[in-house]
Amino acid sequence: IHYAVIDQLTDQPVGSLALMRIDAKNGVVEVGHVHFSPLLSRTAMATEAHSLLMHYVFDTLGYRRYEWKCNSLNEPSRRAALRLGFQYEGRFRQALVIKGHNRDTDWFSIIDSEWPQIHRAMRQWLAADNFSADGQQLRTLESFR
């Protein structure tokens, strides 16, 4: 299920992300196909988009586990997962063949017992008083956890 991220100031799409590998019986879902334009990447709006989707998964759907998987060589994706509160679970070596080459996949997750603390930290980080007049964060997201 793909979701568009819409900039509320311009009413224009600036990115998308998807819920994949949906396992309702076990309450497990993966976030993936995250595509953010330069207007969205590395912004408070990007963090808010992830926070809103996590809130939907945990608090509306009642799921137990939220997964993030990425190419082990994709350092920006790995950093984003960790920054958002995902726990690194391990590397699945040679998990895929992409364009004729082996690809290792790193797995990350947030589970329902971790979600309240992560959600609280995201709300505190996203609060207007955590940003200067020019939009710079005063404290990191990690510092709220």
Show the residue positions of the predicted features:
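A short helix-loop-beta-strand connector motif used in the catalytic cores of GNAT acetyltransferases and
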Residues: 1-4
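Acyl-donor (CoA/ACP) binding surface of acyl/acetyltransferases
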Residues: 9-145
